Amino acid sequence: MHDIAPEVVSIADACLGGLQGRSALLIGPKEQRSLYDQLLRRAHMQNIFQAETPRDVSALLPHVQLVISMPLPFRHTDEAGGSATAPMLTAAIIARGCERRRTPLLIFDLDPLSSVEELAGLLPSVCLYTPEDLRKILPQPTAVEMMAS
């Protein structure tokens, strides 16, 4: 599988004007979070919070500038190919965590089925990269890369 972690961290670095001294929240299975954790630590992030699921993360949101939401293994598609479950990180959860926020919150939704409600991107302090946004801006793997993985 084409690994996009370095590109995602690079985009976050550019959008936030650097990662040093900032804080992040990684949401998803531990094995998926580990590469992002390593890359963010290498970039000298001050705090890296981690959670298996987005439940109860609104209390952490005021303390972070970056959220990376990864695919959760128990999500599945319905017969039409869409998500059979609603987005896990709702706009309401994000709005609660962004009350009185003065700095931007950058959110990357890395779940192909979309784990972050798109309405969250309309909140004044939120910049949301949806799976579709990432497909458009990140380099696509070549056939050679796909065969090698």
List each model region and its residues.
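Amphipathic helical hotspot of TIR/SEFIR-family domains
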Residues: M88-A95
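Hydrophobic, well-ordered beta-alpha structural blocks that scaffold small-molecule cofactor pockets
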Residues: M1-G81, A86
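Conserved sugar-transfer catalytic core signal across GT-A, GT-B, and GT-C glycosyltransferases
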Residues: Y36, T90, D111
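Adenosine-phosphate binding glycine-rich loop
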Residues: A5-P6, A95-L106, L110-S149
